[in-house]
Design a protein with these regions (language model features):
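Short loop/edge segments at beta-strand edges and connector loops
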Residues: 73, 125-127
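Long, positively charged amphipathic alpha-helical accessory segments at protein N-termini or as interdomain linkers
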Residues: 23, 99, 106-123, 137-233
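N-terminal lobe of the biotin/lipoate ligase/transferase fold
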Residues: 1-103
């Protein structure tokens, strides 16, 4: 088992969540914090740009302001995504113990597959970094790797997100035949705490994390406060 902590941040501003992802990676990779699984939701609809994405290509800026959508840049690579307030974002930061990048994606995404299975949803891993249910994307992930450590974070779609086609440029809504939510798979709403518990239990059983309830350290809090604004676009 891997000594680690679990943090549920609840609903937070988009830039705060992105800063926490980055700061936790810094602290874990420097040995000041244990391996960490943390989850959060965003307090407003958000466009999350991959590390190298161009917002002028991916985003319909003319509709952002009227829709009340924030834009942030995350520490990981990958495509531009839309996240609504109902989605749950997971982020795991740990030593890179995996034989390959492909294996790390598969094993961590399998945790999400297991979590969804415990809720009654038949899902499967789609390489390199997606989880599908009913042939549609229900979770997508991205990674950041450095200094022998990795951060993998991703979304779990809990409720339908009708704004996605209005906000993202059509060319970027591809690669899978649409998205699906937990609600659409089950025909009912699943409380957030139930989904979070399922995610936590799957990381214990599938990845061997010995999770203890925790919180951000004082150093992490201070760093997040200082750096949050830098993640806005």
């Amino acid at each position: 088992m891997i000594e680690s902590r679990f943090i549920d941040l609840g609903s937070v501003p988009p830039e705060y969540g992105s800063a926490v992802d980055a700061i936790i990676f810094d602290e874990v990779s420097e040995g000041r914090s244990p391996a960490t699984l943390h989850v959060y939701s965003r307090d407003r609809s958000t466009i999350s740009l991959g590390r190298f994405r161009d917002p002028d290509i991916d985003v319909k800026r003319d509709v952002l302001e009227s829709a009340g959508v924030s834009v942030i840049r995350r520490v990981s690579g990958g495509s531009t995504i839309f996240t609504g307030t109902s989605q749950i974002i997971y982020s795991v930061t740990m030593e890179d113990i995996f034989p390959s990048k492909k294996d790390s994606y598969q094993r961590i995404c399998d945790c999400i597959v297991t979590a969804l299975g415990s809720l009654g949803i038949e899902a499967g891993y789609k390489p390199p970094n997606d989880v599908l249910a009913d042939g549609k994307k229900i979770s997508g992930s991205a990674q950041y790797r450095a200094k022998g450590f990795l951060l993998q974070h991703g979304t779990v779609i809990v409720e339908p997100e009708p704004l996605i086609d209005e906000i993202l440029s059509p060319v970027k809504n591809r690669g899978y035949p649409g998205t699906v939510s937990i609600y659409e798979c089950l025909g009912r709403t699943v409380p957030r705490n139930i989904v979070v518990d399922a995610i936590m239990e799957s990381f214990i059983s599938k990845l061997g994390l010995d999770l203890e309830d925790g919180m951000l350290s004082d150093r992490e809090h201070d760093s997040v406060r200082l750096r949050s604004e830098s993640f806005k676009v």
